[in-house]
Amino acid sequence: MKSIDPRHYDVIVAPVVTEKSTMASEHNKVVFKVQGGATKPQIKEAVEKLFDVKVKSVNTLVRKGKTKAFRGTFGTQSDVKRAVVTLEEGHRIDVTTGL
């Protein structure tokens, strides 16, 4: 049995299911919402261990929080860090199933 470090579950927060990420999945890419301080090597290791796949590359981006009005007052949403993970040929992740 493979040993999974519990910290891997802290790195990967959730899959991102949008129209754009669904189109990227056709090119062997998966998009995840990740912890704000996570580095590319940490993300790569976590995805490889949790999903038992081989990762080719990891690209990250930070989506800045938007200002929204709520009941007459303005607030700011939190920033969200995302990782676009490119998988090696022959490897797939189905984000609709759980771990």
From Swiss-Prot:
Disulfide bonds: none
Alphabetical GO biological process terms: translation
Record's keyword annotation contains RNA-binding: yes
Family of this protein: Belongs to the universal ribosomal protein uL23 family.
Keyword rRNA-binding: yes
Underlying gene: rplW
UniProt GO cellular component terms: ribonucleoprotein complex; ribosome
Assembly and oligomerization: Contacts protein L29, and trigger factor when it is bound to the ribosome. Part of the 50S ribosomal subunit.
Keyword line: Ribonucleoprotein, Ribosomal protein, RNA-binding, rRNA-binding
Cited function: One of the early assembly proteins it binds 23S rRNA. One of the proteins that surrounds the polypeptide exit tunnel on the outside of the ribosome. Forms the main docking site for trigger factor binding to the ribosome.
Origin: domain of life: Bacteria
Species this chain originates from: Rhodopseudomonas palustris (strain ATCC BAA-98 / CGA009)
PROSITE patterns from the UniProt entry: RIBOSOMAL_L23
Protein name: Large ribosomal subunit protein uL23
Molecular-function annotations in GO: rRNA binding; structural constituent of ribosome
